[in-house]
Amino acid sequence: MLGGSSWLSLLALASYTAPGEAATLFAGGTVIAWDPSAQRLDVLRNGSVLVENDSIAAVFSGPYNGTLPPTLEVVDATNDIISTGFIDTHRHSWQTAFKTLGSNTTLLRYFERYGTHSPASTVFTPEDVYIGQLVGMLEALDGGVTTIVDFSHCTWSAAHSRAALDATLESGVRTEWAYNFGDYKNFTFDAQAHLFQDLVADARFRNSSTRLGISYDCFSTADPNRTRTILDLARWASLPSPRARNPQLTQTIAKPTYPS
């Protein structure tokens, strides 16, 4: 994370990989680095970070001993702090439109006013979801968050779901985009399952920092057959699973037959 006016360059770096031999040197800042030999943080005064294409090529303090690329953009990071990006493990980016409204709200009121079954489900259009998701992702980058587990419970229809995914992919944020299976009046569970299969086949994931996941809150309350189907889908799609750490989910599940 980079403070001061230089954050714009770092934001561009995090969200866009330029073609060719692009190189950027963030010079003269305070770098919060990592010492692998001592297994601890290493704070470098007058430190610099050299980035080539989409990778960190060097982290150093003082003059650079190597050869700098001939085409180099230098960003003055004096009086700024440079660190790795933060990780947000639970975010609902589509809810950006509600920001500042729920600061004095109980959990029950939150569910009623702003949650997946709130009036938002009937008022928000797919375009509203897209804008909220994209702005929320870019806001995260602005705050130094570069990796997000996005609990996307705005999946009220196929159009809403695709809008949220489109914005996530466009943002460039490294994201575990967790598609939510919910109890929605106008979007049946079977329709949600078929859409998920379509999303698994989306070619945009192959060259993206976004990875598909599943969010599901009803393991203990929903129809067991529905829960089994969701676990089957997760296994079919080779998604990361909590089963290894949750004894309640370690039962053997037959491999389902779904379209390849």
Regions found by a protein language model. Name each.
Residues 159-260:
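Metal-coordinating catalytic core of metallo-dependent amide/deamination hydrolases
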